Amino acid sequence: MATPRLFRLKAEVAPAPSGPIAQSLPVAKIRVDTGVFHLDQLYDYIVPEKLSDSALIGVRVQLPFGGRETEGIITSRVAHPDRAGELKAITKVLSPHAVATEATLTLIENAAQLYCCNPWDLIRSAIPPRVASVDKSLSVVEAARTTQRSAASPIFHTFSPYLPSHRQMVDLVHGVKRNGSVLIIAPDEHDVDLLVGVLSAAFENVFPLTSSLSREDRYRNYLELQRFPLSIIVGTRSAVFAPVNNLATVIIYKESSIDHCEVRSPGWNTSTIAKLRSDNEGVSLIYTGFSPSLNSAYEIDHKKMKFVSQRFQVEARAFSPSEGALLPGRIFSEIKKALNNGAVLFLAPRKCSFVRSLQKCCALRLWWPFSCCF
């Protein structure tokens, strides 16, 4: 028979006292990572005096919520709470560096309302995870400065069909960089690498910001954005939320690419977020590509977006098929000659289709019939 064990009394663990309350603005409104979709409001917490100097807007903090310790971001400091009753206190400041500005937090709040989601779902995409070693290696600086500007109509800048698009970005960035920092959003990491390569050769303070970087490099670059008054940031989707110091221009590179759409919930789009940011902060917004997307074409047709394009002349020739061959034999000599002047594009219709008449093309307008193209 087993010997019964003695009962042990469980000792109640009381929370450690937080000490005296901060004398100036003792209440912090915090965006808490609740883990629950419908608990998306701001919560009031007491700021202890010992944390008052470091508990600033945009700083990560640890706090008690629902019987556990979780993470939050301070959105503001106020003198009095919105509700009566006893408030819990912030446990500790996780990082001395501000990872978001007031403008960034406002952008996330507006985007959450637009996409009907919990703001923390956007924060996970917008702000990279904390790395303690990087926090210790960098000195604390003032949060990124946001210069209020008058918002202008967005612009669509068309690329020349003769040159690689990433090389054409050098002249475009050179024209807008005199106004302040530039944020470029590219569809994928390959485009980011190409852009960083050509821009680093022409400008200083060029920072990549993608998920393909190591956690240390991504977090370090994210914090470095707030240290330079004039910089160029090249990143993928999540970089559209980055707190850039003295931001003047946002450029959406290849804006018709499907990679600008976030595949995870809530499925936001960089063009939409960039438009919200342009309206909130008054930064210039430039879309680029060889041709506008359907949404941009609608904005251009209704005079809501300025269309900037040079006149390009492309020589087009048609060759009839010979002996059922997909590509006629005499076409190859023409291709070799044209390669001396630039890139060559040739199109071959399917067997069941017809050769389109470019003079009668309706540009695939969304109405029926399409007989004008044949």
Question: Could you describe each region identified by the protein language model?
Answer:
Residues M1-R356, C361-L364, W368:
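Accessory, non-ATPase domains that flank or precede helicase/AAA+ motor cores in DNA-metabolism machines
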